[in-house]
């Protein structure tokens, strides 16, 4: 026991010695009172607070507490903390529990803080005061916040018993922490209480002070004392010239008459922390002044003005003789805050906000740099229209605020659903209590951008609805691009003329449309003083969200969702056509389809945004953001491909684009009846990409320091490597031809692995060197090295594989490029023979002197200098084969080139083999894509059609080969089918260039209406047309039912195929009729199939269905009308009534009638067999025979049949349906 008692004094003694050392070092020089023992006073002060709650744990000193200086807090305290000297552990626990169930309370530290409370950040001039508070000791100054400030505390030494310290955020290395002083500080030295005035202070009340302002002859030299209730307190306005705030005094609250006072003396700005609305004050020695640009005079404080609490016994109202000419009319009464609903203007478009006062707690931080918070879990709070930099650091969940004269805006739109409170410069935001919670760990995008958000409000003059949308859009953009594409501080930096903000540039197109620049700048004095009140928050219009910036992954997912939601087999195959298709044709029609989505298809409209990268794995361009990548097809403009590699790494923003979704479906529908059953879809996948013109996009370079090191998928294109910009060599070449991007085999170089090489994705180009090698000289290139054979065309074969595949989309024939090899010069670098990679024979045939493999670290640059302009002009045109060469049997050159518009794209059977064997997947069907194109030629009015086939290894086809697109094909292989039709196929040398995208809106162009005789004009006649004609006779009629699986004839609904039973016993009906028609100029044989047969026979759907049901039993009925009567062919016995019915029908006026026929030629324009010449035919006219040349009949395929306007409905059986 004795030893224990002896330890206590020694512990206290050690604590007292440490305290004395700390006080002498940290506080003594700062004390101005002479001959005072500072240490005992501080110790007594600490003891008083320590013992104030009756706590005595065996010692009168807080031995567990240690003194801390300002410098120690700033240097060593890296985590938020709080210290409560007079609290026990249970008291702290109760305090911490009030932080809320989801709150993270401030941890407690046992620290003693002393310092001088001041409004000077250092020993500076008085003019540097800006209304901020600081705690200062010998080691430094720390900013602080105090809720209930007494002006008599300034400049005195205090012990702070309850406080919290919040260090700067980790991302803010240049920032400083701050103190939050919870309770009133305890003075170390007794504060002198100033005695009241000996005589009452003569004061003016608001009514008299207001009238005095309007007297012309009594304005000069007037200094008066004003008294009244504080009815309004503006925000603290800080401009480049000065800082100030404006308060209004009235007789009562709310006041009928008020008078405004401007406080702009630096030493008096701290009054803003003292003033509380509803409290009565006296302001002494005020003078009258006039604000520049204002008509009225106002009261303004002087250097000697003081702020006092109004005590009725200490003041006396000053009686004045208010006579003289008035400068202006009586001011309007101070408007009271409105509690009514938002008012609307007569047009119903604009709304007017409500002014009110509100007290509440911050429950969430929505966007701290933008000044957006959540109040009481149901209101939004926007502080952006005030200068709230000092308030921002204390704003976190748990802070209680009092809002004076704040605007309430409801239904602002722009993606915001909750009502929003927003104070303008007239209102005030006052702290009522600090938060018990630790600051949240904000992501970088929630930490940067305060100056940019201020720029949106103060320079762009955005209204609140548009500002809320802009902040949300910037958050979306930061989430898309940061931090992997660029740093948050780069993206959200303040925009200046020499350094524009990347974030703001992305919003400018939308902001310029909704809020054009040039709006009047906010006038703070007018906003605070003018009646009626005008500010950016007073009047607003509900904003329909103009656009959004989805991530590329979200855009891709939305495109797939829309594509599969709209995938309807019954809509892709209309019922009249689908009901006659066998299973194989039915599923092949559904195997490929596509959907084009425009930005307007989304709500709100989508804006495409991403960094342009070139993929070395797929050889295509991609847009990339944080969520992933999306393939893209870009054209500089119509018929002009993308050819400048400098675009790699740039940020691309496009409001006009096409989101393409190609749907690949593997299905096994037995027949059209099961199209509504999704269970027959075995596999479905989609290819999603975007296509747009660069002319419709905004291209922004990304700051270089933000780009990460190159990866194989996104290599850098900057030729200035680690060796610096002064090392490297290059050579110009003219690109003559580019081959297809596909997997190729290359010879194994000597010394390589003995394993069998696998085909690699690659492509080759054929070009011509333009001059010799050039070396880097400064920022440019030196003169070309002389060549021994300058006059000879030096052709070169360049091979691209590996990472160099990324250049595929930028290389186009007719352009001049610079091939750049970084690093120290290497002799003969571009003259090395690469024959080990390719056989010499193809090079000799192409006339190439050498073959060169492009290395992974080499780069390409588009050359467009004036020196090579003649070369560009001479090679600008794309190669085109003549129509004669295309549609002829001349195979001197089987490679053809042409431009065409794609009419259709379908999947079909392979041209050569129907099956291919694949390891582990025997019997998998090969796919072949058929493009039907309309040739672009000036040689004929109606362009001929041609089929282009794409097979492995050119599958899947390149991006953009869609119906409606214009495409240039180079070096397709021309072939002739067994039916003498010309078609083309892809080969390894084929080059495809998309010239234009499918039109956004499809315009249905009616077929031309012609006479049949016009079809004999060869190339001048259309392939498809409409004519008005008359059915002369029926040549033949076939009605049959076939198995939907194997297409064999079905009798009584059963397949007649010999062999294994078909997996499905489903039959479909088919029909063919051949008609002879004439229109007075010529006659033609027309073949109609399936549902067109019903139209030709004039049968309604019910009659047609009944007729087909009669045919189901025999399975097949064939009628030939070669002469008089009808000859019957059938696979089973058919009753004579059916034969008689069909014969009667086909020879009746119901069929032999005038019609409007839409048709296409059975003979394709690509058929190279010469036309049948006119034949000599004998005619009998009475007893005299005649011989004449008769043209062969035209052969047409029916597209549709419509009844002629001149048809008589009496003889048409369909009229009864």
UniProtKB/Swiss-Prot annotation:
Keywords: Chromosome, DNA-binding, Nucleus, Telomere. It comes from the Eukaryota. Residues 327-346 are annotated as: Disordered. InterPro entries: CTC1 (IPR029156), CTC1-like (IPR042617). Component of the CST complex, composed of TEN1/C17orf106, CTC1/C17orf68 and STN1; in the complex interacts directly with STN1. Interacts with ACD and POT1. This is CST complex subunit CTC1. Its main location: nucleus. The keyword DNA-binding applies. The keyword Lipid metabolism does not apply. GO terms for molecular function: single-stranded DNA binding; telomeric DNA binding. GO terms for cellular component: CST complex; nucleus. Belongs to the CTC1 family. It holds the Pfam family CTC1. GO terms for biological process: positive regulation of DNA replication; telomere maintenance via telomere lengthening. It is found in: Nucleus; Chromosome, Telomere. Transmembrane segments: none annotated. Component of the CST complex proposed to act as a specialized replication factor promoting DNA replication under conditions of replication stress or natural replication barriers such as the telomere duplex. The CST complex binds single-stranded DNA with high affinity in a sequence-independent manner, while isolated subunits bind DNA with low affinity by themselves. Initially the CST complex has been proposed to protect telomeres from DNA degradation. However, the CST complex has been shown to be involved in several aspects of telomere replication. The gene is CTC1.
